[in-house]
């Protein structure tokens, strides 16, 4: 008699694109604690060139990355490529106008740094499990 093997259900992949090294290390760890898979990239270009583009189910994206394509530029590039990936923007800019603009452009959420772990968890859950 053989034992039934448990069915392994792949965990959704959340990709983090941020030029800040500390966030590139801490956010994927936090996402993994939520029970998801995570990958981090130092630039939009690195994300676009990666093998993870097609696997990504949610993108946590810094708005401003001076040495690379900006978060909104990456959002437009994904749209141009017809990639429908829910995006959670993170920004140090506390300007509500920018936040509202990003939400109007299709972002799931725009979190102002510093944000709570709970706020990020809620945004990731909303992105991966829309009502």
What are these regions (language model features)?
Residues 21-39:
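Two-component/phosphorelay signaling modules centered on CheY-like receiver
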Residues 97, 115-125:
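C-terminal output helix
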Residues 45-46, 70-83:
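Short amphipathic alpha-helix used as the core "switch/output" element in two-component signaling
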Residues 69, 73, 94-109:
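Alpha4 helix (beta4-alpha4-beta5 surface) of REC/receiver domains from two-component response regulators
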Residues 11, 55-57, 81-86:
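His-Asp phosphorelay/catalytic-motif detector in bacterial-type signaling
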Residues 40-58:
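Acidic, metal-coordinating helix/loop segments flanking the phosphotransfer/catalytic sites
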Residues 65-66:
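Receiver (REC) domain active-site loop signature in two-component systems and cognate sites
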């Amino acid at each position: 008699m053989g034992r039934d093997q448990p069915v392994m259900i792949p965990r959704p992949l959340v990709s983090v694109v941020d030029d800040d090294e500390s966030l590139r290390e801490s956010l994927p760890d936090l996402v993994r604690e939520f029970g998801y898979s995570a990958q981090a990239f130092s630039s939009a270009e690195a994300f676009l060139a990666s093998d993870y583009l097609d696997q990504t189910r949610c993108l946590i994206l810094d708005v401003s990355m001076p040495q690379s394509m900006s978060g909104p530029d990456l959002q437009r590039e994904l749209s141009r490529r017809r990639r429908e990936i829910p995006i959670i923007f993170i920004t140090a800019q506390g300007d509500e106008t920018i936040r509202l603009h990003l939400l109007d452009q299709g972002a799931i959420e725009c979190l102002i740094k510093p944000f709570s772990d709970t706020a990020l968890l809620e945004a990731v859950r909303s992105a991966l499990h829309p009502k």
